[in-house]
Amino acid sequence: MIQAMVKKLNGKRLRQRISSAILIVAILVSFSGILGGTAMLVMGIQYHYALTNYGFSQGDIGKMMITFADTRSNLRAAIGYQDKTLVQETYEAYETKKQACKDYAATVEETVASAEERKLYDQIMSGMEDYFTSADKVVQMGKDVTNIDQRNQAQRLAKDEVAPKYEAIYDNMVQLLDVNTSEGDK
């Protein structure tokens, strides 16, 4: 094919040969540019997918874990402090962290990419609903600094009922982070 083109070009005048050669080079360069642009587009899409579903999502899972741990800390403070002002401040912090945790959980859901991640995420979310229901009950019981018996009962409930739920959810969060990291390494 190339030999036939060369023979055809040799039979033409110099001006036509130069014009034909320039046209062939321009077509080859254009084709290469289109091919390179397409390859860059595909790589960009894959890179964006990897960053969104694995790179950034690991940070989002970490933020969800931190705010979840902060809810526990603020819960303990709200039922443990004796100063009414501190109890109110830690209760407000508890509510703020609880909402932030739910917001991060919604962000994490957008990046769930595998069946295993979905299973863990669903376990976390169902456990979190139960945890926050119990934790809210404990905080309401224990934030009245004048009722010592009720505060003691709230502290026992926090230890016996809320703490095991917290541990189970946090373990699932750690597993979700591990699975997400493993999937991202592939």
Residue ranges and their predicted role:
Residues 3, 7, 41-59, 92, ...:
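Polar/charged heptad-repeat coiled-coil helices used as signal-transmission/dimerization stalks
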Residues 62-66, 92-97, 127-128, 141-145:
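A short, ordered amphipathic alpha-helix with a cationic face
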Residues 18-71, 84-87, 113-128, 186:
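Amphipathic alpha-helical segments and their boundaries
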